[in-house]
């Protein structure tokens, strides 16, 4: 059943922790992006002793962190082979699926053909249809929505089709139903996510509720997760992992409130699951700090996560492998509030794995997926080269 000595793998995604622009960053308007280095430079210093002990300061391009003499983990960085820089494409590539066709974006609103399909299939009109901030557009169109009953449709720099409706005008279940109809249309146009955005309140005090729901494009091919599940391995997705993989290839899905809850749930999984993959995404770095250009908040969130690493390591057995990486960048110090096209860190720890190996610059995030596939003996994924032997051969 795979590489005899590894029974369980913990894969932790520090969402958006890029470590320097990729060679093609200028094609994405991301020249000068370096999420980690720029956060440290902005603040003057950062306290990440546990990531430093693992060797993050030794990774090519990382500056301002201690270059420890004897790291407890092996280290490197990964380039993205797919076209794009979003969460889905990054995570799918980690799991062995490379995407060469970017998701569609509509900075000027959705074309007539898409909106006509929506009106016909959903059986109702709409308001909006432009790129906008969600809080601003409900201020602008909320009252008209209440008068007409028409949902508010808007997008952003990302590949999203967002539908906002007042909970008293359109019950949430009906909004979800309309989103499912929109998901069918979005599938035909390669749109990453349809998002239900319910809100409540009166004019002047509209506010979004926590009943947001994402309807995501499922991976367009098999991933590591599908193969693991088909081979009888438990696959636990913590945080937004379920949404990212279209709720496929998972045996357990665990939702989280925030990063610290994500760490708690990861530790719960370590106590409860003795084999297979535990796959956690800590999204706050990206959602709360990267997109909002809050470098100080990002730095504090990194310090909070770093403090918890010894707890995770404390629950690891000799037959575990612990991998830390990211899915893209989101540099809070650049004018852009969007993701950035960057290298991501690679840290690999195991009580029985060789520490201090420089795994170099890997050509694709898929090297992680292929390493996990080899460790569990499930054969080749579509892409990626395993680095397992570098860590296991004495």
Name these PLM-found stretches.
Residues 1-394:
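Feature captures the catalytic ectodomains and active-site-proximal regions of enzymes
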């Amino acid at each position: 059943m795979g590489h005899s000595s590894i029974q369980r793998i913990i894969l932790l995604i520090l969402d958006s922790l890029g470590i320097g622009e990729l060679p093609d960053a200028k094609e994405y308007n991301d020249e000068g992006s370096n999420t980690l280095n720029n956060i440290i430079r902005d603040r003057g210093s950062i306290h990440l002793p546990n990531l430093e002990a693992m060797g993050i300061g030794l990774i090519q391009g990382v500056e301002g962190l201690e270059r420890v003499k004897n790291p407890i983990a092996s280290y490197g960085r990964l380039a993205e082979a797919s076209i794009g820089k979003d969460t889905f494409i990054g995570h799918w590539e980690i799991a062995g699926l490379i995407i060469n066709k970017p998701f569609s974006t509509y900075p000027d609103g959705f074309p007539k053909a898409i909106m006509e399909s929506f009106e016909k299939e959903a059986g109702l009109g709409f308001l909006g249809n432009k790129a906008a901030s969600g809080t601003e557009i409900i201020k602008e169109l909320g009252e008209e929505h209440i008068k007409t009953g028409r949902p508010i449709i808007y997008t952003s720099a990302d590949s999203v089709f967002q539908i906002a409706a007042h909970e008293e005008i359109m019950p949430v279940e009906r909004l979800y139903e309309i989103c499912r109809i929109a998901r069918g249309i979005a599938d035909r146009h390669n749109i990453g996510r349809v998002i239900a955005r319910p809100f409540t309140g009166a004019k002047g005090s509209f506010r979004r509720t926590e009943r947001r729901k994402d309807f995501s494009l499922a991976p367009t091919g098999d991933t590591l997760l599908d193969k693991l599940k088909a081979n009888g391995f438990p696959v636990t997705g913590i945080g937004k992992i379920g949404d990212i993989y279209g709720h496929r290839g998972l045996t357990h899905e665990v939702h989280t409130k925030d990063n610290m809850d994500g760490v708690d749930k990861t530790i719960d999984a370590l106590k409860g699951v003795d084999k297979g993959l535990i796959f956690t995404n800590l999204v706050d770095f990206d959602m709360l700090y990267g997109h909002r250009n809050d470098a100080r908040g990002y730095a504090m969130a990194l310090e909070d996560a770093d403090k918890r690493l010894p707890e995770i390591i404390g629950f690891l057995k000799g037959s575990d492998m612990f991998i830390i990486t990211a899915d893209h960048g989101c540099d809070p110090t650049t004018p852009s509030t969007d993701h950035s096209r960057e290298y991501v860190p690679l840290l690999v720890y195991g009580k029985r794995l060789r520490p201090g190996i420089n795994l170099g610059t890997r050509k694709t995030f898929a090297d992680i997926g292929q390493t996990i596939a080899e460790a569990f003996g499930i054969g080749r994924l579509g892409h990626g080269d395993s680095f397992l032997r570098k860590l296991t051969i004495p």
